[in-house]
Design a protein with these regions (language model features):
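Residue-level detection of the helix-turn-helix DNA-binding "recognition helix"
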Residues: 46, 60-61
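Basic, helix-initiating cap at the start of DNA-binding domains
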Residues: 1-52, 67, 72, 76
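Hydrophobic alpha-helical segments that form the core
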Residues: 4, 142, 153-174, 185-197
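N-terminal intrinsically disordered/low-complexity leader segments
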Residues: 1-17, 188-205
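Hydrophobic alpha-helical connector segments
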Residues: 75-115
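A secondary-structure capping/hinge motif
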Residues: 63-65
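Amphipathic alpha-helical packing segments from all-alpha helical-bundle domains
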Residues: 123-148, 154-161
């Protein structure tokens, strides 16, 4: 059996400085070893060196620990779009930004393939995925609307959701494979198979 993750230490006499991604990584390792349902806040507290009360104050639910990397991924997504010209093909822009959003994801890189395996196998975590990624999906939908003026809002959101599902499917396959190679490369390879074309009402026949 794998050893327990090293504690996320805090300095005595000072307010707790909590690293959400380090706590999330520790929780995911415990879930992979012991099972999600069998791991409580006290277990996560013992693994991180942070009191259960403090953990529950910072995280709205145990499931939220699986998605602590979403804010950083959303920032990478929007920052990448700012560097991309508006006149490049939409599929190229979306692929570049989505890949950038996962390329430096500390949770994916540090937790390894068991992150996606745990999420895929635990219904509570899988059901929380779309809700947790809502800020990321909304940011992607806004960018699609900016690059395709006149496109219906529903279409922009549908395409954004499709890219979210495609990226997660690529990460699931990457995790099941070992994982070997880069998670960003796995996402890039899958998204290259997508060719999104949005027709605005003015362009419709």
């Amino acid at each position: 059996m794998a050893s327990d993750p090293p504690p996320v230490r805090r300095r005595r006499g000072r307010p707790t400085v909590l690293d959400p991604e380090a706590v999330g990584t520790a929780a995911l390792r415990l879930w992979a070893e012991r099972g999600y349902g069998a791991t409580g806040w006290d277990d996560i507290s013992a693994a991180t060196g942070i009191s259960a009360r403090t953990l529950m104050r910072h995280f709205p639910s145990k499931a939220a620990l699986a998605w602590v990397g979403v804010p950083a991924a959303t920032r990478r997504l929007t920052e990448t779009f700012r560097t991309l010209p508006l006149d490049i093909p939409l599929s190229d822009a979306l692929r570049a930004a989505v890949v950038a959003s996962v390329s430096d994801d500390a949770l994916v890189l540090s937790a390894g393939g068991y992150w996606m395996r745990v999420v895929a196998e635990e219904p509570e975590l899988a059901e929380a995925s779309a809700r947790a990624y809502a800020p990321w999906t909304e940011a992607l939908a806004r960018e699609i609307a900016r690059r395709r003026p006149g496109a219906p809002t529903a279409i922009c959101h549908a395409v954004a959701a499709a890219y979210r599902e495609a990226a997660q499917a690529a990460l699931y396959d990457w995790a099941r494979g070992g994982p070997d190679g880069s998670p960003a490369h796995a996402v890039d390879a899958l998204l290259r198979l997508l060719d999104i074309r949005i027709t605005t009402p003015e362009e419709a026949p």
